[in-house]
């Protein structure tokens, strides 16, 4: 009997007889003939068994040991369904829906929700409901395409509505769909292209060094939805708790969203007289964010907040309380002493944070010079050598778009930006050249800052960096002879392109980290991100024009658009001979340099000075919970199990809160008002439910067994 005719024992043929047999070899199912022989290769029936996804590897969130490699859930040696008609079409649909919702909510209240988590939840739910097999790769692609919505919206609504606001005062200033669409589209494309050379550094080489809070939460949603079991149950329960909790706050207002020391009589007196104030956002989503960020970074961020709110603001009141200080010629008439602590923060102290972020960013750029140099060197080397099989040698999960294509793409995009500026924004070729240089230099350099911020706290300080861009652009444009309404238009379009580039770059690093953990192909994520950017830019442009005609940005009942109003308030005086708050920027710069000298991470500290304290305090509480649950035992494995359980709970809080944020936005859009009348007890009563979810998170994690 020849070797290929030997009877084969298998689960379906334990006796080794000649019955029709299926045998599993690794993960391949082979059909054998009745005589036990293998069929001809043309007729071999190979069926890939459905892979059972359980959870992320143990080393997914920690630094790797020397020689240790991270192995993603999807094997780098295999190909999986990623780009399919299902994933592309659903990704586009998600982009349109969430772009419209985020644009309305952002212009209405100034807050843009992150779409990645809700889209991941929807993708997992649909794939499970339709019983799609091995859908994890598809779901990553759906999330990656769809998440363009929040990034493009943030880039657009922070700057471009300022054009409509100024148009009301200067009728000669023109705004149309083309300006909004192209500034969003070109900025988004630049953000993607500028980030690709840094993907490996942030995603692979810095593995375990950054918490990537939003990427962690989104990945947990995708993996738990695919795996089922205890992880999915924990995520579902915590998601329901966090979602219901945040929905009650945002839709009904049963208790206050913010708990402040002013709810107590002594706190109100101290806030009025000394301008000393502490606030905590009581939302479950922000608490979960703090848990994932961890105690180290949360503490540094809060130190920045404490410096501003407990030292700088009270000192300003003490020293200049009786004076009117108008650093930007914006028409401020109140004395410092007559302002609230919130007003002092908004008009003065926050600019210190902007100066700190800009300086910390520049320091980070200098420190990252080696990374930038290697990225540029890689690009240069691809042009100097002939095409080889090098790309084929790179494993699937580390394969990017060719650096040659990236460089050519950047050059072409900047050329289109030049054409856009020359034909649709300014009348002078020289001004168009200057505009392109500003866009290219600032967007490239601050891409690393945006990615760094997202990796640390999950929050992109894009409005602060954009404000700095607007000021620099205004100074340069005035210096080359462009001012007045033409200068305002040019500076705001430049700011819109840069803002969108930084917003997309920050959001995209989250997508790429998700793909790295799961095992997606970066090249596919990068390629199809451009489609999401195109769809989101078109949607945002159309929605913004409709909202302007429906509500407007000025007058009674107008959309608030707080960031755009701030941009308009800054740029108008500068283009008409005003100035910027250089003293405050300088103070922030000095603080960042001192921190760098003492080896304290300056960027998270500066973020704390810029982000309102009510969003930073719960991060400290969440970070403290993560420290507590991961240090209670002498058993390292038990501590890790507790930490992982807490991460699932925190991810559920974030996911539930994000999803209910979308529901609340829809209700607001439909003008469904179920909000209770505010009363004196709504704020202090928030202590009870907030303490309850803190205790739930800690106890549920502590009870975990190995």
Which positions does each model-derived feature cover?
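Short, Lys/Arg-enriched N-terminal segments with co-localized hydrophobic residues
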Residues: 31-48
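Cationic, low-complexity basic patches in intrinsically disordered or flexible, solvent-exposed regions
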Residues: 6, 20
């Amino acid at each position: 009997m020849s070797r290929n005719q030997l009877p084969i024992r298998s689960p379906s043929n334990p006796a080794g007889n000649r019955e029709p047999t299926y045998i599993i070899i690794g993960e391949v199912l082979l059909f054998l003939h009745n005589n036990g022989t293998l069929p001809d290769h043309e007729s071999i029936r190979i069926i890939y068994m459905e892979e059972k996804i359980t959870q992320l590897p143990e080393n997914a969130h920690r630094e790797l040991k020397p020689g240790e490699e991270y192995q993603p859930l999807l094997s780098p040696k295999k190909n999986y369904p990623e780009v399919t008609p299902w994933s592309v079409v659903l990704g586009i649909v998600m982009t349109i829906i969430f772009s419209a919702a985020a644009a309305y909510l952002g212009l209405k209240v100034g807050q843009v929700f992150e779409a990645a988590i809700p889209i991941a939840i929807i993708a997992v739910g649909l794939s499970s409901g339709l019983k799609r097999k091995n859908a994890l790769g598809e779901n990553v692609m759906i999330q990656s395409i769809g998440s363009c919505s929040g990034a493009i919206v943030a880039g657009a609504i922070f700057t471009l509505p300022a054009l409509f606001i100024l148009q009301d005062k200067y009728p000669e200033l023109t705004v149309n769909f083309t300006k909004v669409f192209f500034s969003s589209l070109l900025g988004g494309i630049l953000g993607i292209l500028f980030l690709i050379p840094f993907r490996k550094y942030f995603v692979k080489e810095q593995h375990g060094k950054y918490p990537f809070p939003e990427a962690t939460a989104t990945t947990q949603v995708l993996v738990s939805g695919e795996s089922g079991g205890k992880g999915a149950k924990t995520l579902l329960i915590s998601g329901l708790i966090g979602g219901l909790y945040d929905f009650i706050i945002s839709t009904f207002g049963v208790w206050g969203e913010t708990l402040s020391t002013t709810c107590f009589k002594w706190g109100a007196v101290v806030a009025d007289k000394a301008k000393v104030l502490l606030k905590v956002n009581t939302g479950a989503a922000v608490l979960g964010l703090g848990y994932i960020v961890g105690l180290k970074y949360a503490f540094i961020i809060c130190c920045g907040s404490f410096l501003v709110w407990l030292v700088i603001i009270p000192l300003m009141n003490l020293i200049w309380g009786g004076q009117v200080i108008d650093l930007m010629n914006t028409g401020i008439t109140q004395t410092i002493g007559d302002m609230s602590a919130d007003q002092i923060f908004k008009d003065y102290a926050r600019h210190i944070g902007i100066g700190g972020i800009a300086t910390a960013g520049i320091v980070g750029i200098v420190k990252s010079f080696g990374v930038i140099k290697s990225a540029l060197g890689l690009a240069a080397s691809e042009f100097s050598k002939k095409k080889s099989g090098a790309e084929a040698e790179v494993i699937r999960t580390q394969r990017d778009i060719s650096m040659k294509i990236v460089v050519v793409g950047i050059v072409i995009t900047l050329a289109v930006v030049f054409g856009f500026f020359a034909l649709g924004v300014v009348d002078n070729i020289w001004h168009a050249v200057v505009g392109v240089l500003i866009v290219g230099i600032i967007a490239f350099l601050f891409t690393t800052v945006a990615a760094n911020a997202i990796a640390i706290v999950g929050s992109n300080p894009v409005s602060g960096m954009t404000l700095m861009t607007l000021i620099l652009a205004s100074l340069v444009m005035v210096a080359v002879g462009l001012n007045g309404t033409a200068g305002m238009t040019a500076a705001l379009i430049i700011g819109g392109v840069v803002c969108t580039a930084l917003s997309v770059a920050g959001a995209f690093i989250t997508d790429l980290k998700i793909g790295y953990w799961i095992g997606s192909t970066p090249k596919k994520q990068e390629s199809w991100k451009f489609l999401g950017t195109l769809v989101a830019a078109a949607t945002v442009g159309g929605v913004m024009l409709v909202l302007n005609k429906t509500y407007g940005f000025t007058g009674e009942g107008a959309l608030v658009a707080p960031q755009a109003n701030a941009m308009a308030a800054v740029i108008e005086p500068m283009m008409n001979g005003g100035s910027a708050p250089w003293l405050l920027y300088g103070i922030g710069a000095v603080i960042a340099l001192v921190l760098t000298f003492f080896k304290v991470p300056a960027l998270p500290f500066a973020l704390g000075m810029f982000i309102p304290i009510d969003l930073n305090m719960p991060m400290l509480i969440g970070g403290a919970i993560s420290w507590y649950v991961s240090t209670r035992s002498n058993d390292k494995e038990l501590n890790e199990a507790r930490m992982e359980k807490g991460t699932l709970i925190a991810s559920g809080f974030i996911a539930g809160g994000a999803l209910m944020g979308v529901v609340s936005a829809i209700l607001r859009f439909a003008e469904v008002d179920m909000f209770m009348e505010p009363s004196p007890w709504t704020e202090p009563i928030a202590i009870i439910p907030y303490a309850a979810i803190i205790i739930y998170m800690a106890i549920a994690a502590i009870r975990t067994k190995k």
